[in-house]
Amino acid sequence: MTVKKIAILYTDEDNEWSKPWGNFVDMAIKLLEQTRKLECIAEDVEYEVFHVQKNVFPQLSDLQKDEYLGIYITGSKYDSFDNEIEWIMKLRSFLNEMLTSKTEYPPVAGICFGHQVIAAALGSSVGRNPKGFEGGVVSLKLNSVGQKLFGAQELNLSEVHSDCVFDVPEGYQNWASSEKCQNQGFYRQNRVLTFQGHPEFNSDVAQKGLLKSQDKLTLEEFNRYERQCQELDNNGIQAARNIWRLFLQKI
């Protein structure tokens, strides 16, 4: 029996600030393994990492094979809308080809930068958030789409971002908003689920990410976000169960 694969597109270098918890791939695999067990998926899964920030991409023809269950795009410190860095421009073209083609490809989950670069690839406007940096553990208000997807009115997710997506790609639905970010995630049935937040970050990681970006906030904002890291339940694992449901084409 062929072991099914998840293709992880790693869009960053290893960061010193997150080192105690590993890099974004380490945290992604830990999250996917935790949620795989919660979803009672007994089959073994292989995680195949592609260092796209080093211009290492999967072949589109390979992704059409049945061995791939899904594609996971990590977060990154880079700008998804950059027009000078080769691999970012190549990634947008790669995603546009995959997501607009009539050919069937595995479902795609995008995290933070992954959320933004998917939107940019589909023609949405992405840039610096005029409302500023959003970080720590943030409460998201779910709309009717999000409530149906996640079975809740609100979700608390880790966030570390200064960029945002300004409009929803055609054929997709936004599922949540926050005080500073109107489009917190996109959904297309059986195809795409994105998170502006980081479901793979526990609250300690979120707090460390907040600390490294303290200079982007007023003291009042920083203190409020820091309190939220300590007081709000982090629903990252609960939310990420839907990544597996997407990969299995149950949502």
Swiss-Prot record:
User: What Pfam families does its record include?
Assistant: GATase (PF00117)
Question: Which GO BP annotation is one of this protein's?
Answer: intracellular monoatomic cation homeostasis
- For this UniProt record, give its keywords in alphabetical order, as a comma-separated list: Cytoplasm, Glutamine amidotransferase, Transferase
Q: Which residues form the Glutamine amidotransferase type-1 domain?
A: 48-232
* MF (Gene Ontology): transferase activity
Task: State its Enzyme Commission number(s).
Answer: 2.4.2.-
Its localization reads: Cytoplasm
Q: Which residues form the active site?
A: 112, 198, 200
Q: Which GO terms describe its cellular component?
A: cytoplasm; cytosol; nuclear periphery; nucleus
Supply the induction statement.
Induced upon copper deprivation.
Question: Hey, what's the signal peptide range on this chain?
Answer: none
What else does UniProt say about it?
Present with 1510 molecules/cell in log phase SD medium.
User: According to its UniProt entry, what is the function of this protein?
Assistant: May have a role in copper and iron homeostasis.
Q: What is this protein called?
A: Putative glutamine amidotransferase YLR126C
This chain's source organism reads Saccharomyces cerevisiae (strain ATCC 204508 / S288c) (Baker's yeast)
